[in-house]
Curated annotation (Swiss-Prot):
Domain RdRp catalytic: 979-1094
Biological role stated in the UniProt entry: RNA-dependent RNA polymerase that plays an essential role in virus replication.
Chain residue ranges for the region called Disordered: 572-688
Residue span, Peptidase S39 domain: 318-515
Signal peptide start-end: 1-33
Pfam families the record matches: Peptidase_S39, RdRP_4
Cross-referenced SUPFAM superfamilies: DNA/RNA polymerases
Family: Belongs to the luteoviruses RNA polymerase family.
Any single Gene Ontology cellular-component annotation: membrane
Reactions mediated catalytically: RNA(n) + a ribonucleoside 5'-triphosphate = RNA(n+1) + diphosphate
Protein name (Swiss-Prot/TrEMBL): Protein P1-P2
Length: 1181
């Protein structure tokens, strides 16, 4: 019945028409009229009886004034014999149809002016008489023949009926539109006669508007002319809805009155049964109990303790993991205790700061289930006083607040900021646990995301659920909620809060929070258009959201209707007030008053000219681009998700595809996408972006002067970094080192390097002289040998082959922007922005360049301009490349880590070549997909940059893969490794790399790029030339240019991937049949000839143990650290466990925890000895 009351659906009519057309083509006699014998064709609607009328055309009016068509043959003339036969027949037989008396088939009565449909319905007596006559006169064959004739005629009748109906509707629409247009014209004539002056003025304004916006004006005129049709459609829709509601109301009233007797009878039976039970119960003697209320509570409490908790959650200590704790109190007023009705401990909750200044309490749902009271430092409140603001049942997460005035003061809470899931990184966090009335802090390590939550290495006990995980700023980043099932993961788990707009995250775009995290650190990444993971429902106050969570991605939240989802969980249990559908259901029945939020203002200062070392880029309101929203709507259009095109002088529409020589300068016109989008062209001598215009006079060039072998001093720049005092042991480290021979040996073996321009220049001179000496005798392999090695390497990396990025085919603006934002999201936020961008005041790190939309747009302009410069121009020399805007100088500095004393004495410090943020993004756009695919496929290719040894199963998987290459078992490989492999390590590899090896690596990359466009190949080749022969910038601003190409830049985006592949190619040159590599480390087959490395100018040595990546293999799944003394020396430096600052103490504890994880397979006596020598036995549990 419910479906009957719905509005009429047009699908049935279309289905009938489709069936009619099908019959029309399947049955040859459809639409044609047979003669009375059933075999001949009837005369058509024409003067000649021999004519045949087509069923596809509409019938023409006949010459007679009125022509009644009794059948579907549309015959206008009948013979006298037909008339006589019709009168003699006992039936009213028209055409070849047999109709009984009183029956008349639907007939069209046509005249020259109109056509009418005549339908005559018989009475019941006639129907009965005709039915009896049919049974008497007709046999089965006759009935089948008549039915077949009826089916044959039906399609033609349907088509004619539909055609006439369409004609009538068209005439009606024509009449309405003509009448409406005449009325509009009469109004215009009246206005012209009444006020001719204003009429002329209005006409002039209309003509101007039509000239300025012709499309919009014409659209408005069309809407005015067709207003009656729109009104008719609205009234039609409204009328159908009204009729539907009336029918539904009538049906409900009918059902109510019809079922009333039965409902009354059932209620009377229930009353009788209840009365009989009461009478029976009153006749029994009443029991008397001598137990007091106190005794009852005692018994019920004992029963509850015996039964245990309603929602038990297992806690776990990971076997083999030694977790140390420091005696430390947590931040006051943050951790709250949850108890049941008897005061017994259930779990914990955390006071957090939400958006708009609101205070909330976050806790697991299973803790909320057993909690009756929430206890704070000052007092306690009942759980019934709190209402739900956020709930995700899949993650067992809940956020509550209270409408009670001053509830925070009653509990004594001091809330801390709450971060969302996209800010959680894979690192150590502070976890405070209470043991015997004392609080301890431990380094809980978040090692991996899983099922929308996190795998956390921590030591917990039953009752610890709800404890927060703090970062270094004491912000709440996650909440502990027990352990994983034993068959899933051995670690504990924690959940984080999803970014809900105006509740747990701001509704305005956040750039630093979602754009600058490293791909190796961030656990989950917010992504748009992602739906491959598990669907998660987030219920909040008055609104419901949904998202999808994959292995490491979280889809942007989308709004969802708050319907049946409220049937489960705390919010569903609190649904007491069903009338108030504007707020979330709650337990206490009290409404929550929202807190008003303030507005923030942004600076609009323009960019200054000149060096710009004390200014920041401007933020223009006119620019539009893509932000990183915290949520999205499902109904959002494509334009709302894509950045809008920017209008600037550097872009022009052009479809040319050739290279032209204009006044001796090469200018390449970028092909457009063919869809009206803009392509960009940059002039080599005129700054086209705001950022490049600032640095127009930033560099002071001078005549080249040799400063080191292979390096010339070519100028300077205002960028300077003050020399920091040398780092050394802390006072605590010096004290404990004097009391231990082991620690004293560590301090004698390692030390901290010098920093500053002098240290950088001295180390540069050492490395340059060493490189020049090696390259003097080095040889370059023949071309055919190089090509053969390129083919072999390409086959080894064949599984990482990917199509070329889409933006490189047509340089479409939207595709380039999308790739740019993907690259920005993978930047390391705290990494230096490089030269010259770090010269801005307050812009020394990457995250300061993408902190809002305007600054990111300025960066996008610069990256886009540089890409097209790489495409349009050629590399001449390093200085000219900087002048032409092809590349930025590379910042050179000493890596701040412990060095061996031998390197300290020789001033052979490890140098880091830091690439600027623009060049970093350019490299990511050129090679991002390829490098990410290598990380995913590291177990299937020789390069192992994605490998880790922090877990035993990772070690075992690597050992088994190497054993498969060597043709033996993992255990045999470890026991007899010298028979199967050769561990090698290259000294000073980055500074020894020749240019031809970098070119061969690029050749392999191009071979692995399917459908490589010419433009992408050109940009990659120019990029490599700029990288291979660069300008270095020291800490004092001195600029040094390479005179000979080569040297791998350690801070480049491709360093890890390229070094690993070049290391594999070198192993092939040395004669190895197989090799696995990571950076400059390699495991090669026993047939490798290490003397070939020296011929190529690279120093390579064989290790004395089964060593790979500073780890020594002791079993197929057991490795121990090789540089333990270096790690311990770092523990004695910097921060200490005696620091007055909590952040310093936790930093030291995290370092200790990392060392203990590396030492997890070392003898326990050695670990205890280390703790004893450090003298922290009384501080560390």
């Amino acid at each position: 019945m419910a479906s009957f009351l719905k509005p009429v659906n047009s699908q049935g009519l279309w289905l009938s028409l489709l069936l009619a057309i099908t019959y029309l083509f399947l049955l040859p006699s459809a639409g044609q009229s047979l003669d009375p014998s059933g075999i001949g064709l009837a005369a058509g609607c024409s003067q000649s009886q021999g004519g045949i009328s087509s069923f596809a055309a509409l019938p023409r009016p006949c010459n007679d004034s009125v022509c009644t068509l009794p059948d579907l043959g549309w015959s206008c003339q009948r013979t006298a014999q037909d008339t006589a036969n019709q009168q003699q027949s006992p039936f009213n037989h028209t055409g070849h149809f047999l109709t009984t008396s009183g029956w008349t088939w639907p007939n069209w009565t046509c005249s020259p002016s109109q056509c009418q449909l005549l339908i005559h319905l018989p009475t019941w007596q006639i129907v009965k008489q005709d039915f009896l006559l049919l049974l008497k006169e007709w046999d089965l064959l006759t009935m089948c023949q008549r039915c077949s004739d009826l089916l044959t005629k039906t399609p033609g009748f349907i088509l004619r009926f539909a055609g006439e109906t369409l004609i009538l509707v068209a005439n009606l629409i024509e009449f309405v539109l003509v009448s409406w247009s005449l009325w509009l014209c009469s109004v215009l004539v009246y206005v012209a006669q009444a006020v001719p002056g204003k009429f002329l003025l209005y006409m002039a304004a209309f003509c101007t508007t039509f000239w300025a916006w012709p499309r919009e004006t014409a659209s408005s005129l069309i809407r005015i002319v067709t207003t009656p049709l729109t009104l008719i459609g609205f009234l039609n829709k409204t009328g159908i809805g009204l009729i539907s509601h009336c029918l539904a109301l009538t049906w409900n009233m009918f059902m109510t009155w019809s079922l009333l007797p039965w409902v009354t009878l059932m209620k009377m039976m229930k009353i009788l049964i209840t009365s009989s039970r009461v009478l029976t119960r009153s006749g029994r003697p009443k029991r008397t109990s001598s137990k007091s209320l106190k005794h009852k509570l005692k018994i019920s409490r004992a029963i509850q303790k015996k039964q245990g908790k309603k929602t038990p959650v297992e806690e776990r200590t990971i076997p083999g993991v030694q977790i140390k704790k420091l005696r430390e109190d947590p931040p006051k007023g943050v951790i709250l205790r949850c108890t049941d009705q008897f005061g017994d401990h259930v779990g914990y909750a955390s006071a957090v700061k939400l958006e708009k200044g609101q205070t909330g309490i976050v806790l697991p749902i299973h803790v909320w289930t057993d909690t009756v009271y929430i206890n704070g430092p000052n007092g306690k409140l009942k759980m019934a006083d709190f209402t739900a603001l956020y709930e995700v049942t899949n993650h067992d997460s809940l956020i509550m607040t209270s409408a009670m005035a001053g509830w925070g003061s009653i509990l004594g809470v001091r809330p801390r900021p709450l971060t969302t899931i996209d800010a959680v990184k894979l690192k150590n966090y502070s976890l405070f646990t209470e043991r015997d009335g004392k609080w301890y802090v431990q380094a809980a390590k978040c090692i991996a995301p899983a099922e929308g939550m996190f795998r956390v290495v921590s030591d917990t006990r039953p009752g610890d659920s709800g404890l927060p995980l703090f970062d270094m700023k004491m912000n709440v980043v996650a909440v502990h909620r027990g352990t994983w099932p034993s068959e899933r993961f051995p670690e504990n788990r924690a959940f984080a809060i999803l970014p809900v707009p105006d509740l747990t995250s701001s509704s305005s775009p956040k750039f630093t929070g979602c754009e600058t995290y490293s791909e190796a650190e961030t656990a989950y990444e917010m992504a748009d258009n992602f739906s491959d993971g598990e669907e998660i429902l987030i219920r909040t106050k008055g609104q419901s959201y949904r998202t999808f969570i994959g292995s490491n991605k979280v889809a942007l939240l989308s709004i969802r209707k708050l319907e049946e989802e409220l049937s489960r969980g705390p919010i569903g249990l609190w649904a007491d007030d069903t009338e108030d559908d504007e707020s979330a259901p709650r337990r206490s029945g009290k409404r929550i008053i929202p807190v008003d939020s303030g507005e923030t203002k942004s600076s609009e200062d323009p960019l200054p000219k000149g060096r710009g070392v004390s200014s920041t880029p401007s933020r223009s309101k006119s620019r539009k681009g893509k932000a990183c929203p915290s949520f999205r709507n499902d109904a959002g259009t494509e334009e709302s998700r894509q950045p809008q095109e920017e209008k600037g002088q550097s872009c022009q529409e052009d479809s040319l595809n050739s290279t032209q020589e204009i006044q001796g300068q090469s200018t390449h016109f970028v092909p457009s996408s063919g869809t009206g989008r803009k392509s960009c062209e940059s002039s080599p001598h005129r700054p086209t972006t705001k950022i490049t215009s600032i640095f127009e006079d930033f560099y002071r060039w001078k005549e080249p002067r040799e400063e080191a072998p292979g390096f010339n001093s070519v100028g300077s720049c205002p960028f300077t970094v003050y020399k920091c005092p040398p780092k050394g042991l802390s006072s605590w480290g010096e004290r404990v080192a004097r009391t231990s021979a082991f620690l004293q040996a560590c301090t004698e073996k390692y030390s901290w390097p010098e920093t500053g321009a002098e240290a950088e220049l001295s180390s540069l001179r050492y490395q340059a002289a060493r490189r020049q000496s090696a390259q003097t005798t080095a040889v370059i392999p023949p071309k055919d040998v190089r090509e053969d090695l390129i083919k072999r390497t390409t086959e080894a990396y064949r599984s990482t082959a990917l199509p070329a990025p889409m933006w490189a085919h047509n340089f479409d603006e939207s595709h380039m922007r999308f790739e740019f934002w993907e690259c920005v999201r993978k930047l390391k936020g705290q990494a230096g922005s490089g030269v010259p961008y770090a010269a801005f005041s307050g812009r020394k790190t990457n995250d300061k360049w993408v902190f809002d939309h305007e600054s990111t747009e300025d960066l996008w302009e610069t990256v886009r301009d540089r890409l097209f410069r790489l495409l349009n121009q050629d590399f001449i020399d390093p200085v000219q490349a900087v002048k032409d805007g092809l590349v930025d100088p590379i910042r050179l500095f000493v890596k701040l880590e412990p060095h061996k004393m031998e390197k300290i004495r020789n001033k052979r410090y490890r140098l880091i070549a830091s690439v600027s943020i623009v060049d970093q993004l350019v490299a990511r756009m050129l090679f991002r997909d390829q490098n990410e695919e290598e990380l995913l496929q590291h177990m299937a290719i020789p390069s192992k940059p994605g490998l880790g040894f922090s877990q035993d199963h990772q070690v075992l998987a690597f050992t088994e893969s190497v054993a498969a290459l060597a043709g033996t078992s993992a255990q045999d490989l470890v026991d007899n490794w010298s028979r199967y492999l050769t561990p090698t390590d290259c000294s000073g590899f980055d500074w020894s790399v020749p240019m031809w090896l970098l070119e061969d690596d690029l050749a392999v990359r191009n071979e692995l790029t399917l459908g490589l466009p010419h433009g992408l190949r050109k940009m990659r080749e120019t990029w490599l030339k700029c990288l291979g022969q660069s300008v270095f910038c020291l800490s004092n601003g001195l600029l040094l240019a390479q005179t000979s190409p080569g040297i791998q830049k350690s801070g480049s985006f491709n360093t890890s991937s390229t070094n690993s592949r070049m290391r594999y190619m070198l192993a092939l040159y040395a004669g190895a049949s197989w090799a696995v590599t990571m950076g400059d480390d390699a495991l090669e087959s026993v047939g490798s000839d290490l003397s070939q490395y020296a011929r190529l100018g690279i120093k390579c040595e064989r290790a004395e143990e089964f060593d790979f990546c500073s780890h020594l293999f002791r079993a197929p799944d057991v490795v121990i650290p090789k540089n333990l003394e270096k790690m311990v020396y770092g523990l004695l430096s910097g921060t200490s466990p005696e620091s007055p600052l909590l952040a310093d103490r936790f930093s030291w504890l995290s370092a200790l925890q990392s060392i203990l994880e590396e030492m997890r397979h070392m003898p326990q006596d050695f670990v205890n000895m280390l703790i004893e020598h450090l003298g922290v036995g009384d501080l560390v549990e």
